C-alpha cells in the first residue's frame, strides 16, 4: 500500500474518523484493501441514506455488481440462503442469492428500483416476503467479528456503519477505470479528489478498532 498517496487524507485514525463523518452526513467513502489481497477499492454508502443519484454513480463508475452488506442476523431474518452450499471463491466472499423488492419496482434494474430493493431489505419490519429472488441487488453476509475476523470490504462496510452509529447495513461496488479495468489506489485517489470524497483502507479500520478496543 502506497502510504504517500494516503497522507493527504490524514493519519490512520483521521482517515477513519473522516470516513465516519462522511457516512453520517449521507456521503460516500472509498475503501481500499491490501495490494496482496484483492488490491481493489470500493465505493461505499450507508444503506439507510442511499439515494437514486448515489446508486446511479455506483452503476456508472463501478463494476455494476452492487452489493448490500448485511450482518448475519439480518441475512437470517430475511431468510436468504447462500448463493452456493460450498463456497470456492478465492476470497470466500459470502454472497447470498440476489434479491428484488417484492413491491414498488418495475424491472428492478434501474437506480431507483435498486434503492427500493435496498430499502425493503433493511426496513425495521422487513421479512422474507418483502423480497423476491433472483434480483439485481447482491447481498453479502459479513463475518460476525468484522475486519478483525476477515479483512474484506464486506466486513469493513458493516464495521463503518456501526462505528458511525448507523444501521449496520451498507452498499458497495468496486470502482473501475473507464476501460473496464479495476481501479487501483492511484485511480481511487484521483476519483476521491474529483468527487470530494475521503479514502481509507481496511488496515486503517483494523488499526482503529484494535487501538480503541472496539
Curated annotation (Swiss-Prot):
Q: Where is this site: Essential for catalytic activity?
A: 136, 174
The alphabetized list of GO BP terms reads:
riboflavin biosynthetic process
Q: Which Gene3D superfamilies match?
A: DHBP synthase
Lineage, top-rank taxon, reads: Bacteria
Concerning SUPFAM superfamilies, the annotation shows: YrdC/RibB
Q: State its cofactor.
A: Mg(2+); Mn(2+)
> Binding of Mg(2+) 2: at which residues?
38, 153
**HAMAP family referenced in this protein's UniProt entry, alphabetically:** RibB (MF_00180)
Q: Which PANTHER family match?
A: 3,4-DIHYDROXY-2-BUTANONE 4-PHOSPHATE SYNTHASE, GTP CYCLOHYDROLASE II-RELATED
As for family, the record states: Belongs to the DHBP synthase family.
Q: What is this protein called?
A: 3,4-dihydroxy-2-butanone 4-phosphate synthase
Q: Give the source species.
A: Nitratidesulfovibrio vulgaris (strain DP4) (Desulfovibrio vulgaris)
